[in-house]
Amino acid sequence: MAMGMSMASREAFFYDEKGLLKTPNLRTYKLMHIGQEPDYRVGFVETPEDGSPYGVRPYSEHGIIGIPAALANALSAAFGKEITSLPLTPEMLWRL
């Protein structure tokens, strides 16, 4: 879940006018760190997968896939404007 939240709110590649990467290392690439995460409330909905043994589904990918879209959708509803890009930085939200 932390990875999905980090993808949604801060991770991005930035390039200069020559096309060179301005965020080439972890010092300049903005990852979420321990203590910067919100408290999560998690609920699971069981929907078996018909095409797999015992109806199992992948577990670890759900937070990565759903959280950026869910956060963008919630902020879009709150601001009353369509959000079509990530990351959802404070600067980007201010410009809405």
Label each PLM-derived region with a short phrase.
Residues 1-96:
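C-terminal catalytic domains of large/alpha subunits in multi-subunit enzymes
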